[in-house]
């Protein structure tokens, strides 16, 4: 049995507050050796392990009543090596380090992470384990910046993985949903520090559609916040710069009063009278951005790169994010726009805002690109690896093109359907999320692994309940679609999972893995 100290009666709750767990034991190992010991002990005791970091996944994928492991004490920098002639550096860190801690270290060295998502609270291991991404026509999954990984597999073996050492296991571990092993260290490729110069425009929804074919490749970093009842969008575009910082844009809901007022309005519209929702959106939009359409000559801000990448996620929320081919984006947005409007007319359901619309380019060259002529503000990635993870949910048919030739045909469109939980109160999501998922599915989309996708009883595997026996927000599962979508890649992932974890040490919360096709029910002896 493990000699590592543990806590009993610990309650884990995810950031959104939707799910909680009271594990039998809660561990915080302080070294890689302790992680190895812990996995071996769990195997001998026939216990399962789940690793958690910041708990930002809004789903129940990390819920367990057995052993829970947190790597926050594995937060040291192991090595930092600069390659000035190639204009990058490689930093090797413990996998429990949070991104904001890594950002602080890199900033002091004059370097930056190349691309990030909307927050920096995740751990180095956690951010790649479910396929996290930023929003750029040139950059792909965050994992493409990782040069190598060291994991402890289910046999308690320490394994070093990269494109040359166990490349197939590497491709499984780059997006593992926690089922291949515990990532204990990683090497990340970083670039000389840069600021982001951004413009923020208010445009109509119709103008967004008119600009669709050229808009997404107009800046290195780009995202849209869609307000369907207001029929307006906020278009944010950013590029690297060495200009001096002048701070972020002002935010009404970034103030204590604005934030409280918005959450109160959401509570009233969800708990007392739902048809108020469109009016709440219009009021909040006008307070945050004003009534008039603004051009790109309006709000211009220069911030550090991390402030440019990150955004205020506001309140506890259900999030259902899917990615589909950008070429299908016009059809998707028109369909969703019509459905949202009709649902409001019929008082069937209402959506919350902003709906975040983003893109990525997960196409990969056959080999790493020449970086010898880059500058601090050169666009595009310096790849840590050119391996596509087996469980990458982005379109697999897109083909790599040099930056100057990138079009929508290389891109993945991401849409976030977000429903807030004002003051921690659950809000109905099933009607809206089901329609959203069906729309994205028809357009060739797949869900983000960490989010609150629902699926259906007809798509799940293993035992299912009657539809009426599920909670409104309860996941039904997507196993049959997952098998169809991922095909041979899923078969390879399952084979590697079984080889690396023959005793199912990392199969806590088996139900989540079964209903979503990560494992075949026949793999389990029980």
UniProtKB/Swiss-Prot annotation:
Its main location: mitochondrion. Its EC number is 1.1.3.37. It is an enzyme of class 1 (oxidoreductase). Pathway: Cofactor biosynthesis; D-erythroascorbate biosynthesis; dehydro-D-arabinono-1,4-lactone from D-arabinose: step 2/2. One of its GO terms (biological process) is dehydro-D-arabinono-1,4-lactone biosynthetic process. Gene3D superfamilies: 3.30.465.10, 3.30.70.2520, Uridine Diphospho-n-acetylenolpyruvylglucosamine Reductase, domain 2. GO terms for cellular component: cytoplasmic side of mitochondrial outer membrane; mitochondrial outer membrane; mitochondrion. It comes from the Eukaryota. Coiled coil: none annotated. It catalyses: D-arabinono-1,4-lactone + O2 = dehydro-D-arabinono-1,4-lactone + H2O2 + H(+). Its cofactor is FAD. GO terms for molecular function: D-arabinono-1,4-lactone oxidase activity; FAD binding; myosin V binding. Residues 19-193 form the FAD-binding PCMH-type domain. It is found in: Mitochondrion membrane. The modification Pros-8alpha-FAD histidine is found at residue 56. Keywords: FAD, Flavoprotein, Membrane, Mitochondrion, Oxidoreductase. It holds the Pfam family FAD_binding_4. The N-terminus is blocked. NCBIfam families: FAD_lactone_ox (TIGR01678). Belongs to the oxygen-dependent FAD-linked oxidoreductase family. Present with 6190 molecules/cell in log phase SD medium. Can oxidize L-gulono-1,4-lactone as well as D-arabinono-1,4-lactone and L-galactono-1,4-lactone. Monomer. This is D-arabinono-1,4-lactone oxidase.
